[in-house]
């Protein structure tokens, strides 16, 4: 009977065959231990010399790391294993014998591992990170489908930038200029006027020359937009969404979290409502904490965000930033005209901002004024202005960065490990 490592627990005390790769092995004179993986999980195969023919035992001792094989044996309980079971091997069939595998069980430097990213993905920890990423994506679709959102796919090639920055990847679009999308937000606002609640999930590109552990050049974003929704209501959706994906990972990825040595007690504390602190109060807090490198009207850096998040030890919303440091489309704060109705969600443990969101300007004249203040080409935003001409409504939205969220939940130090093939400032290969 052919099965997988994950499904093998259904076949205790039965003989099965599994297609797998050998990740590692050790042997003595009478027994060989084979560490196996098949994409669904990792399992130990035990080859006892007295219970197999001489050829099979010799094969178990000689087989090379990452060779592919069909392995047949009986699934037995093993309380020492994370899975709770292992295989007592009866026979081994080589599918392909691997050459000298470059990533050995010893430690390797980061550059070496990134040069061999196509192989590094096979390791137990990298496998765990990708499984957690997959669960976050699955839970994302689940949450938005259950809450009445329609999935919309905005274009990746665009003629304008929603953030109003120059850090864009430029390309020729026949006889016109085009840019790789920084965000699908403006198109999602248009879709929200048709469908009410919408979300997108896709790649975004930012030509930022940043080399921090939080930045990628190409990354994936989840961008919901909601008609007839104010800023406070949007914050509630955001915290419900983040709580949902954290709980989903806790429910479905315990083996992966264990493989990463993740302290899950920190994740178990994540529950709504999240704490909120205004930008003004955050500045005051930082001053009291001894930060003298930040003044009102300046954006927070990583040390500032970390200090604020550590104070709460939970995801925390920083609300109502100064107008001058935020994009042109954000709705003014009626209680303070120098700030806008926005919030950044800061993840704990030093992972920084994972969500940026705001209520959007719904008044045509004000939006035109802001576009001019930011010295943007009004013609490029004519379709966006149309949304305020024909049935404009209060509406809000946000964007969640997938890779930073994966980094926080999985507990990995650098965001490069959360993308299967990360694009960094000096890395376009593999």
From Swiss-Prot:
Signal peptide annotation: none
InterPro entries: Aa-tRNA-synt_II, aa-tRNA-synth_II, aa-tRNA-synth_II/BPL/LPL, Asn-tRNA-ligase, Asp/Asn-tRNA-synth_IIb, NA-bd_OB-fold, NA-bd_OB_tRNA
Catalytic reactions on record: tRNA(Asn) + L-asparagine + ATP = L-asparaginyl-tRNA(Asn) + AMP + diphosphate + H(+)
Keyword Acyltransferase (UniProt): no
Localization (cell): Cytoplasm
Keyword Zinc-finger carried by entry: no
Chief location bin: cytoplasm
UniProt record, GO biological process: asparaginyl-tRNA aminoacylation
EC number assigned by the record: 6.1.1.22
Pfam families according to UniProt: tRNA-synt_2, tRNA_anti-codon
Keywords, alphabetical: Aminoacyl-tRNA synthetase, ATP-binding, Cytoplasm, Ligase, Nucleotide-binding, Protein biosynthesis
SUPFAM superfamilies according to UniProt: Class II aaRS and biotin synthetases, Nucleic acid-binding proteins
Gene Ontology cellular-component terms listed: cytoplasm
GO MF annotation terms: asparagine-tRNA ligase activity; ATP binding; catalytic activity, acting on a protein; nucleic acid binding; transferase activity
NCBIfam families, A to Z: asnS, PRK03932.1, PRK05159.1
Annotated family: Belongs to the class-II aminoacyl-tRNA synthetase family.
Subunit relationships: Homodimer.
Entry protein name: Asparagine--tRNA ligase
């Amino acid at each position: 009977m052919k099965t997988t490592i994950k499904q093998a627990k259904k076949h205790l005390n039965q003989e099965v065959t599994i297609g797998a790769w050998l990740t590692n092995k050790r042997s003595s004179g009478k027994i060989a231990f084979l560490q196996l993986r098949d994409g669904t999980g990792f399992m130990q195969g035990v080859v006892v010399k007295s219970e197999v023919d001489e050829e099979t035992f010799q094969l178990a001792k000689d087989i090379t790391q990452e060779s592919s094989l069909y392995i047949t044996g009986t699934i037995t309980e093993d309380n020492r294993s994370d899975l709770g079971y292992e295989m007592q091997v009866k026979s081994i069939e080589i599918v392909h014998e691997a050459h000298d595998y470059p990533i050995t069980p010893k430690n390797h430097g980061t550059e070496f591992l990134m040069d061999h990213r196509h192989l590094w993905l096979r390791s137990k920890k990298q496998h765990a990170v990708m499984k957690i990423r997959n669960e976050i994506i699955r839970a994302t679709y689940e949450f938005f489908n259950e809450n009445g959102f329609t999935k919309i796919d905005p274009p990746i090639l665009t003629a304008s930038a929603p953030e109003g920055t120059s850090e864009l990847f430029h390309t020729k679009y026949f006889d016109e200029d085009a840019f790789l999308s920084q965000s699908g937000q403006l198109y999602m606002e248009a879709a929200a006027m048709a469908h009410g609640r919408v979300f997108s999930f896709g790649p975004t590109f930012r030509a930022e020359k940043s080399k921090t552990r939080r930045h990628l050049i190409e990354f994936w974003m989840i961008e919901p937009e909601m008609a007839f929704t104010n800023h406070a209501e949007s914050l509630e959706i955001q915290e419900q969404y983040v709580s949902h994906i954290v709980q989903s990972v806790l429910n479905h990825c315990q083996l992966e979290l264990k493989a990463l040595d993740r302290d899950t007690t920190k994740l178990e504390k994540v529950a709504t409502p999240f704490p909120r602190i205004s930008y003004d109060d955050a500045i005051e807090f930082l001053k009291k904490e001894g930060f003298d490198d930040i003044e009102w009207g300046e954006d927070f850096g990583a040390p500032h965000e970390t200090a604020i998040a550590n104070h709460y030890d939970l995801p925390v919303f920083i609300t109502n930033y100064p107008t001058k440091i935020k994009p042109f489309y954000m709705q003014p704060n009626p209680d303070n005209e120098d700030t806008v109705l926005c919030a950044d969600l800061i993840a704990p443990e030093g992972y920084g901002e994972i969500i940026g969101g705001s209520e959007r300007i719904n008044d045509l004249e004000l939006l035109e004024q802001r576009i001019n203040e930011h010295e943007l080409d009004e013609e490029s935003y004519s379709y966006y202005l149309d949304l305020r001409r024909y049935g404009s409504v209060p509406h809000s939205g946000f964007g969640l960065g997938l890779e930073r969220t994966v980094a926080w939940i999985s507990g990995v130090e650098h965001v490069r490990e959360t993308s299967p093939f990360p694009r960094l400032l000096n890395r376009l290969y593999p």
